Structures are given as structure tokens and as C-alpha cells.
Amino acid sequence: MVTSSSGIKETTDRLRGLTRKELLEAAWREWGNYKGKKIQEYFDTEADPRGNRWHDLSPYTWARKKSSKILTETGALRKSIRFEPKGGVVFIKSDIAYARTHNFGSAVKHIPQREFVGFTEEDRKMAEEIFRRVLRESFSAGSFAVRENR
């Protein structure tokens, strides 16, 4: 085995400078970019994160609607979704008042759930992959090298 210690001090100094929060926020920011694209796909396909089609609109709603797509009248809802990594977690937000009602549904208002924000097994795996890569890249940023001769 050949081990080079060149750059170990620089690498460890750099890693000491990175806080847990910074690493988590970097990973969550990347995951937010991934999930943002997935959410746009849900609006395009009119399906929830597990691939189930959204409930159709009522005939009354279709009659007064200007768009031929569910949850897309002006596009404001789909454009409003944003991700905010903060304190080691990520918040998925929208300033649109009716976003929560459509995502979770409302028995009182007789609006069925049309989920566009949800966490799937695929999302979990992607988060794990991103977190591993962010850590791996953080540790390999210096010139420390380990090579095995076989």
C-alpha cells in the first residue's frame, strides 16, 4: 500500500472549517434542486409523487377554467414552490394560500387531495446518495491519496 500524506493537514484544516450545518445545508440545497424538478414533473403529468393520477376536476370547475390542466390556471402555484435549507433540515414552502389545501385536500371545501409535495422511497434514496456524495467530496477535496498495490 502506498500512502501519501501530502495535503493531509490542509484537508483536515478545511474539514474543521466546514460545520455540520454547512454540509447539511449544501446537501439539502442539492436535494431541493432534485425535488423541485420532480414537483414540476408532477404538475406536467398531473400525478402525485407515487404516480397516482390526481382526482379529476368537477364539470363545474372545468366549465369555468381557462386551462386544460389540473392545478394550472395561471401557473402561480407550480412556480411558487421553493426550498429553504435551514439548521440541518429543508423546508418546502409556497406563499400561495391555497397550496396546502390542494396538496392535502379539504373535506370542508370538498376539494380532493392532489398531492404535489410528498416524500417517496425514491426521494429518500436520492437524499442518501446526495448526502454520501457531499461528504465524500468534502473529504476528498485535499490532496490526500491512498492507493493499494495488489
What kind of feature is each model-predicted range?
Residues M1-R150:
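Short, Lys/Arg-rich flexible segments
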